UniProtKB/Swiss-Prot annotation:
Keyword Ribonucleoprotein: yes
CDD domains: Ribosomal_L30
GO MF annotation terms: structural constituent of ribosome
GO biological process: translation
UniProt KW keywords: Ribonucleoprotein, Ribosomal protein
Pfam families for this protein: Ribosomal_L30
SUPFAM superfamilies, sorted: Ribosomal protein L30p/L7e
Keyword Ribonucleoprotein: yes
Name this protein carries in UniProt: Large ribosomal subunit protein uL30
Membrane-crossing residue ranges in chain numbering: none
Cited NCBIfam families: rpmD_bact
């Protein structure tokens, strides 16, 4: 997963979700386990991140 858009001006819950996913700056990437909790977090910020299968 890669952060593609900035969290500046986004609601607090979206900013905290991006942090919880381990993303800090635009372009940061992480490989995460495919769990229901992670999927829920991705759904919350799907407009800010790009997910590669």
């Amino acid at each position: 997963m890669t952060l593609k858009r900035s969290v500046i001006g986004r609601p607090k819950n979206q900013v905290e979700t991006v942090k919880a996913l381990g993303l800090k700056k635009i372009g940061d990437s992480r490989e995460l386990a495919d769990t229901p909790a992670i999927r829920g977090m991705i759904k919350t910020v799907q407009h800010l991140v790009e997910v590669e299968a």
